[in-house]
Design a protein with these regions (language model features):
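Dinucleotide-binding Rossmann-like beta1-alpha1 core, especially the glycine-rich loop
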Residues: 46-134
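Short loop/edge segments at beta-strand edges and connector loops
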Residues: 8, 79-81, 237-241, 247, ...
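Mid-domain catalytic core of redox enzymes
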Residues: 89, 241-348, 361
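Conserved flavin/dinucleotide-binding core of flavoenzymes
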Residues: 42, 98-101, 315-424
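N-terminal Rossmann-like FAD-binding beta1-loop-alpha1 element of flavoenzymes
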Residues: 2-29
Length: 424
């Protein structure tokens, strides 16, 4: 009998297991695959070790930075280079994303970069909400609903949606407001209008430094070090063991073994409790040798609006223009990460498609001979649980939403409450 059985060794499960073992509890962790880390992992492309999934994390709340410090990675937390990202709209040329914005919501709708992006009429429509400060829209459930009500559809469709799809692979109308932009609802209630709420939140995060950060050498180092800590602290980590069914106080593995203990589910999709449909995402990584990219023609990358003609990618990250450590490791070559919805990446020569998309998005024709290496990684992300069966403890993306920052915070909080409760 173990005190806790954690099912799933992604970042959610690893953080929970570490918190529990550090509080003196016995922990068994079951991981279906042969490695820890889940969606946070690495691969080697063109001789460079790169993140094959998540490559950065939100700094809000300071939770991930605190975790990195406790894992001995404090000196390796790095901010991205300040080049900014671009947007490829459905029609017309790419433009630099408005500087003072949050998930595409402008803090000053009449700024010249907002007008350049959506036109004066739509920018003025967005500005008007500041003339009528009121909590109107604050009860909105989704991010899209709130922004549409306050600032109009053009801000949602042309600025917010391309960004939200790039990060979360869903539309702003499908994304819960509090998960997408923690603190925005409260700021709106306090300030009275959305642009002001965005300015308020931006000011807070500016005081705290960049909104996102990475780890020198790659974010996968977080899960590598979490895994090492679990071994060091005596967690019984079982790789290649899949949970077939879970109860609140026991797990039955696919091999029929029953393991008793308080169960924490950290495996998205395992409970299947009224989930939204899952989605497949494909990440294409190109390492290219093309000196014309040294000037970072589209800053740190390009988000792609739905319907951009001839482009299948959802987003492109110019990773060597985003991370100094990576530019140094690449020794003059460039690393481009393009994300695709699976249906756009199935049954095609993805290396060729990615090269064509990168050429169009970066405005620099990439000759086939410039490609040093290419890698394709397919991910399946189960839908978010709408509810969890009574009494089940759940951590990770299933319940915290997409992103390392939300997951680490939720997992730490839940595991902490369990040991605090039983201590009291
Ligand atoms: C391409 C891509 C890029 C991303 N980029 C970023 C980014 O830059 N920044 C960011 O913050 N987030 C990013 N994300 C999202 C982030 O990686 C995830 O939200 C997070 O890693 C999910 O962690 P998790 O522990 O909840 O789940 P997972 O990482 O999915 O881990 C769950 C684990 O459970 C295991 N498992 C499943 N079923 C069972 C079972 N029955 N029994 C035992 N084990 C089981 C799985 O094998 C897996 O190891 C990205 C995601 C993708 C796909």
């Amino acid at each position: 009998m173990t005190d806790f059985v954690v099912v799933g060794g992604g970042v959610g499960g690893l953080v929970a297991a570490r918190r529990l073992v550090l509080a003196g509890r016995s922990v068994t962790l079951l991981e279906a695959s042969e490695r820890l880390g889940g969606t946070v992992t690495s691969h080697t492309v063109g001789g460079i070790v790169l993140d094959a999934g998540a490559e950065s994390f939100a700094t809000r709340g300071g939770t991930v930075v605190a975790l990195a410090k406790s894992l001995g990675l404090g000196d390796d937390v790095v901010e991205p280079l300040a080049e900014g990202a671009w947007l490829q709209p459905a029609e017309g040329a790419a433009f630099r994303l408005p500087e003072n914005s949050l998930l595409g919501i402008p803090s000053w709708p009449l700024a010249s970069d907002v007008i350049a992006a959506i036109g004066f009429r739509s920018a003025f429509r967005a500005y008007v909400e500041s003339l009528i400060p009121a909590p109107y829209g604050a009860k909105s459930v989704t991010l899209g609903e709130l922004v549409r009500r306050r600032m109009g559809s053009d801000v949602v469709d042309r600025l917010v949606n391309p960004i939200v799809r790039g990060v979360h692979s869903v539309d702003a109308d499908e994304l819960e407001l509090d998960a997408a932009a923690p603190g925005l609802r409260k700021a709106l209630l306090r300030v009275g209008y959305l642009a002001g709420a965005v300015a308020d939140l931006r000011q807070t995060s500016a005081r705290a430094g960049s909104a996102v950060a990475g780890i020198r050498g790659g974010v996968h180092r977080l899960v590598d070090n979490l895994g090492s800590d679990l071994s060091r602290f005596g967690v019984d980590v079982r790789l290649g063991v899949s949970a077939a069914s879970v109860e609140a106080d026991s797990v039955t593995t696919a091999d029929g073994e029953r393991i008793d203990g308080t169960v924490i589910v950290a495996a998205p999709g395992l409970l299947g409790g009224g989930t939204a449909p899952g989605r497949r995402v494909v990440l294409a990584t190109l390492v290219v040798d093309e000196p014309r990219l040294d000037a970072a023609p589209r800053g740190t990358g390009v988000l792609v609006a739905d319907g951009a003609p001839g482009i299948r990618a959802r987003a492109l990250t110019h990773a060597t223009a985003k991370w100094r450590w990576l530019a140094e490791a690449a020794e003059g070559k460039h690393v481009l990460r393009l994300s695709y919805d699976a249906d756009a990446a199935d049954d095609v020569d993805l290396a060729e498609i990615a090269r064509a998309d990168a050429s169009a998005l970066l405005g620099v024709p990439l000759d086939p001979s410039s490609t040093v290496d290419f890698a394709r990684v397919a991910w399946y992300r189960p839908g978010r649980e709408r509810y969890t069966p009574n009494g089940m403890l759940v951590v990770g993306e299933t319940i915290a939403g997409t992103g390392i920052a939300s997951i680490v915070a939720q997992s730490e909080a839940l595991a902490g409450s369990l040991v605090d409760d039983s201590n009291g």
